[in-house]
Amino acid sequence: MLKPMYYEFFFIFPKERELFESFLLDATHLALEESSLENLKAFDDKETIGFISQSNWHYFATHDPLKKDLKENLKEKPPHLKNFVILRSQKDLNNSLIPALEAFCLNLKQNLQSEFDFFYLSRNLASKDWLEAYKQAILPVQCTKFYIHPSWHQKPSHVVTNDCIMIDPALAFGSGHHESTSMCLELLSDIDLKRKNALDVGCGSGILSIALKKQGVSALVACDTDSLAVEETLKNFSLNQIPLLVQDKVIYGSTQKIEGRFDVIVANLVADVIKSLYSEFVRLCNHTLILSGILETHLNSVLQIYYNGFEVLEQRQRNEWVALKLLKKQPIN
């Protein structure tokens, strides 16, 4: 009997990585894993290291839209392998996703008046082997007081239940391992949230909403424009045995559906979306706004937009990712 297969794709995006990642999320609704050779070495994954180092990477470029074998080129430019994105699917997406990604690349060239390219590899493996490898790779992480772990890892006896967040990172949503999520949790942990009302924009897995509830917010609203994210948030609320009170809401849709003002707003998104939401955050924020998911290269453009309405209280950076804690400027009478 043949084993069921799954497919693994590796992508390198030299420019505007977050735009390409957003496209992959929208196109597939599958998990994306940001990784590097250093991460693979840490997990002693010699098989994958050998595969990505020795395989012939496919290449697409808007200035020369013919795929090329760039094995030798990559050997001459090892920085390409420092950061890459992994996508796993039960279906072979070579004949659908890759052409769509090429078309997206050409659209970017037309819209942004710049050249773009990407590299990719794919392989297929036995599903059972992948599932076990996946579980071994998703380890618990300690982020401030929170111990974040998947359901197949038990919490240590010395960690109290209220400091645990159980997340099974099966979809493309926050699990606490990504720098932008961990910095959000750190910034939230520094705030007294008891009896505050809070808004989580782009709730994803619900990890930040769960942290807000565990820190004592009296009313919570979470929203996401992805229906799968709303389902995942509700599932993880149940998994963590956190009841949704009458004043709590999980909304499918954007901030336009939300009324009132909030003491604390957290938004772990991407820079372009954060910039587009400025006027909404001015309308909804009463005091503190936490923004994350900003690549360092986009930080100045975000700050230029938010300068008039908010004061920067704190800025954190981990690798290329930046998070901001902002204070709403009050109008002068």
UniProtKB/Swiss-Prot annotation:
Catalyzed reaction equations: L-lysyl-[protein] + 3 S-adenosyl-L-methionine = N(6),N(6),N(6)-trimethyl-L-lysyl-[protein] + 3 S-adenosyl-L-homocysteine + 3 H(+)
Name of the protein in its database record: Ribosomal protein L11 methyltransferase
Annotated compartments: Cytoplasm
Family that this chain belongs to: Belongs to the methyltransferase superfamily. PrmA family.
Effect caused by changing residue 109 to Q: In strain: NCTC 11638
Effect on the protein upon substituting residue 65 to S: In strain: NCTC 11638
HAMAP family: Methyltr_PrmA (MF_00735)
Top EC class, one word: transferase
Biological role stated in the UniProt entry: Methylates ribosomal protein L11.
Effect noted on mutating residue 251 to V: In strain: NCTC 11638
Residues where S-adenosyl-L-methionine binds: 181, 202, 224, 268
Keywords recorded for this protein, A-Z: Cytoplasm, Methyltransferase, S-adenosyl-L-methionine, Transferase
GO MF annotation, one: protein methyltransferase activity
GO biological process: methylation
Superkingdom of the organism of origin: Bacteria
Keyword Methyltransferase: yes
Consequence the record notes for mutating residue 27 to T: In strain: NCTC 11638
Gene: prmA
GO annotation, cellular component aspect: cytoplasm
Keyword Chloroplast: no
Predominant localisation class: cytoplasm
InterPro entries noted in UniProt: Ribosomal_L11_MeTrfase_PrmA (IPR050078), Ribosomal_PrmA_MeTrfase (IPR004498), SAM-dependent_MTases_sf (IPR029063)
Mutagenesis / variant outcome for changing residue 22 to N: In strain: NCTC 11638
